[in-house]
């Protein structure tokens, strides 16, 4: 019966109070009930203190922290080196802050010093002019004849293709450079005699001429090569008469018949047909 007494005493107190005080008391009681429901281990959906609706678990690390009066660390908090740097900026205007660029020149110099402590600081830095001189001296940047180098690359590609096809049993005809002809002893030597394949039975003999001047291999590249196909002019072939359908009548004679009208012309043709029909004795009669 104790709770009844308390409830009666509460009601007596509320009668003496004003309306505003009664509303405040009711709100406080509702808040107490909500807090009891939050911590009784149940799984409920209600509007939490952050103003969002969602399922809330009372058990967990975050809730334990809240019950102890601690707060979770928010995301994006500076820690470690960044926190120390920010602490060193305290009391300094943001306009006077050091740049946050990683590869700043000061950092690079300190990094070089750490790597090479015995080296002088000026020896590691090379100017752009010295680098240009180095690249110009190197053999790879020497000026070359691009036309000839491209021609040789094409030749190398052709020889590679020829070897690839010849290994597979296909006949290949390749054009060799003059330098290669002169370098190969088998091709430069002329046989002492040759037998002809013809049925005449004549024998041709070739004799070495010591007085003949042989070209060295260096001059072989200067020999005139055959001209390129796009530079050679094709011989002008004779203009052919266009073939057409032969005309069965003279168009000039038709044009000259300006005195006869079309009606007269058709009348003459009709009379000719009638005359041919009567002479042949045909059974068909044409009515004019």
From Swiss-Prot:
| Compartment annotation | Nucleus, Nucleoplasm; Nucleus speckle
Q: Name one GO molecular function term.
A: mRNA binding
Sorted alphabetically, the Gene Ontology BP terms of this entry are: mRNA export from nucleus
Among InterPro entries, the record links this protein to: FYTTD1
Question: Where does the source fall among the domains of life?
Answer: Eukaryota
Annotated motif UAP56-binding motif, positions: 11-29
GO cellular-component term (any): nucleoplasm
Q: Which residues are in coiled coils?
A: none
Keywords attached to this Swiss-Prot or TrEMBL record, sorted alphabetically, are: mRNA transport, Nucleus, RNA-binding, Transport
Task: Work out whether the entry's keyword set contains Lipoprotein.
Answer: no
**Stretches the record annotates as Disordered:** 183-202
Q: Does the keyword Transcription apply?
A: no
A Pfam family that this protein carries is FYTT
Q: What does this protein do?
A: Required for mRNA export from the nucleus to the cytoplasm. Acts as an adapter that uses the ddx39b/uap56-nfx1 pathway to ensure efficient mRNA export and delivering to the nuclear pore.
Q: Name the family.
A: Belongs to the UIF family.
Protein's name in the database: UAP56-interacting factor
Q: Which lineage is the organism of this entry classified under, starting from the top rank?
A: Eukaryota, Metazoa, Chordata, Craniata, Vertebrata
């Amino acid at each position: 019966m104790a709770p009844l007494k308390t409830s009666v005493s509460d009601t007596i107190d509320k009668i003496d109070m004003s309306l505003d005080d009664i509303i405040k008391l009711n709100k406080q009681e509702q808040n107490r009930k909500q807090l009891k429901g939050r911590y009784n281990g149940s799984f409920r959906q209600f509007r939490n203190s952050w103003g969002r609706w969602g399922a809330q678990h009372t058990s967990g690390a975050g809730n334990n922290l809240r019950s102890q009066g601690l707060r979770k660390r928010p995301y994006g908090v500076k820690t470690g080196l960044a926190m120390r740097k920010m602490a060193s900026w305290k009391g300094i205007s943001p306009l006077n802050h050091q740049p946050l660029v990683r590869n700043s020149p000061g950092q690079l110099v300190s990094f070089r010093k750490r790597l090479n402590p015995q080296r002088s600081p000026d020896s590691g830095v090379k100017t752009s002019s010295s680098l240009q001189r180095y690249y110009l001296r190197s053999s790879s940047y020497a000026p070359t004849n691009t036309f000839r180098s491209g021609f040789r690359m094409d030749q190398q590609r052709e020889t590679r293709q020829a070897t690839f096809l010849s290994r597979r049993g296909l006949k290949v005809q390749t054009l060799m450079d003059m330098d290669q002809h002169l370098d190969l002893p088998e091709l430069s030597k002329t046989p002492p005699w040759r037998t002809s394949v013809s049925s005449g039975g004549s024998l041709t003999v070739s004799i070495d001429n010591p007085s003949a001047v042989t070209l060295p291999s260096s001059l072989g590249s200067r020999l005139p090569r055959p001209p390129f196909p796009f530079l050679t002019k094709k011989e002008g072939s004779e203009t052919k008469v266009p073939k057409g359908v032969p005309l069965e009548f003279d168009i000039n004679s038709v044009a000259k018949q300006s005195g006869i009208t079309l009606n007269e012309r058709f009348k003459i043709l009709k009379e000719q047909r009638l005359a041919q029909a009567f002479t042949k004795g045909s059974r068909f009669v044409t009515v004019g």
